[in-house]
Amino acid sequence: INIVSHSMGGPVTLFWALNLRDKNSPRLQKFVPIAGPFDGVIFTDDVPNQNRIKENGEPVWQNAAYQSYYEKRDDFPKGVSVLNIYGNLEDGTNSDYLVTNASARSLRWLIKDRVKYYDEKMIKGPMAQHSKLHENKQVDRLVNNFLFD
């Protein structure tokens, strides 16, 4: 199966892949999280520019959910292709208003050793706002090209 998710659908898919998937589950082939808050949500447990991604890809700050994902990282299915899409309003917050770029990009550290392919695409400007990302033509093109080319 291919899964395209928005917002909390990303962590829900990750949780499924790490904890609920079994031998009878469909094989995950492609995963496209859009604006996935894998390591915090602004106004809940994250603050703009509080966290950053180290040069090696590891997030400096890791919330409890992220730590639990990390402990189970070896259960992520091998051979999945991932396109991680996130937004940057370019207003100094390094976020899409609800999800920081660091939170979205923290997915790589969790699954980098398991995936066949991993890429990240930052969408910039007003149409990179959290709820507008899934209505964005640039995002539509990226998703279609990734899934069908």
For the regions a protein language model found, what residue spans apply to each?
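C-terminal catalytic-base region of ester-bond hydrolases, centering on the histidine
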Residues: 75-149
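Serine-dependent carboxylesterase/thioesterase catalytic core
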Residues: 1-79, 96
